[in-house]
């Protein structure tokens, strides 16, 4: 919003000279970021994004936008949602001489695909699932093609943690590593800078589905991921193919500790320096589906029939200190990486969520 705020205020300033800059391009610039928020109006913290940035902080801009675009229904909806959390006491509200009807619940916004940025937002009621496949992001990019985040309407249960302060050692050694993102790590290495490809996107009233591939993140390995969200159920299928054997680590960065009925064994993770950030690691060796409870959610893990796999859990640096209003939603300063590990040429992991 840093440049967008300047553009909007400039457009408002030149109106006195009968210059109208409130065109379709500016309209789309205002709609796009607001369309990508979670149900609690916080933004996913992609790349070097600071965790806890909220649409509520921009409500004054949407007061202007609503007025200049003739009480546009979407901007009116944005204002209604923001004023669920804050009072309408901004100076811009005095200029926008309309009454904003109060609402007490989140309006159901549709699933969306941001083609240029390269990510999708699947929505079902207040449930949101995001998949990121697009351009690397230059100097602020993270090696996290096909990474996901899951928001249950109250908070993230699978998180994209964004960045910590740049001077903190964990910035480059943990938060900017593939391992700290909910995607696939191969042979304990970071993904290469690349751009993935969208294969399909469909939006429904009660969810949607998306599939994308990342053929260039690891030499000789092709990755593909498909998400299907319908009501309160999510199916996540990730596949990888290669002519050679690899160590595949399917990772989910959880905000709550997963609870299993099966016990495990202590393991020390030292596959690469980034793995050293995961403490108190436990491994469970499996050859059949495994289920766990994550807060209020339930998840089932399946791999290809007959294939042995390991489920590794532990603790690692979590959502960085920043916006206190959002951090209060999380009980712990840690995140809880869940790693499904397979050593083979091919990988197919299916997780089914109910949340």
Which positions does each model-derived feature cover?
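CBM-like, beta-strand-rich accessory domains located in the C-terminal region of large
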Residues: 164-355
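Carbohydrate-active enzyme catalytic cores, enriched for enzymes
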Residues: 2-157, 343-344
